[in-house]
Swiss-Prot record:
GO terms for cellular component: mitochondrion. The keyword Disulfide bond applies. The keyword DNA-binding does not apply. Belongs to the PET191 family. This is Cytochrome c oxidase assembly factor 5.
Length: 74
């Protein structure tokens, strides 16, 4: 479930997904229990669904066809 709410100031394109991805990584067992960096945990496969959604959102910013349809994500 997204933790991003509409009353927060907009942090640019895909800001909500970026914030949720960071929160997911910081709350993961990899960071909390094992003490690894969020970057290492992201490479190991934690929060894959948010990582993919963030990638698709960023890609849709550059895609000319998606400019008319709107950005994917929130």
């Amino acid at each position: 479930m997204p933790k991003y709410y509409e009353d927060k100031p907009q942090g640019g394109a895909c800001g909500g997904l970026k914030e949720d991805l960071g929160a997911c990584l910081l709350e993961s067992d990899c960071v909390v229990q094992e003490g690894k960096s969020p970057r290492q945990c992201l490479k190991e496969g934690y929060c894959n669904s948010l990582k993919y959604a963030f990638f698709e959102c960023k890609r849709s910013v550059l895609d000319n066809r998606a400019r008319f349809r709107g950005r994917k994500g929130y």
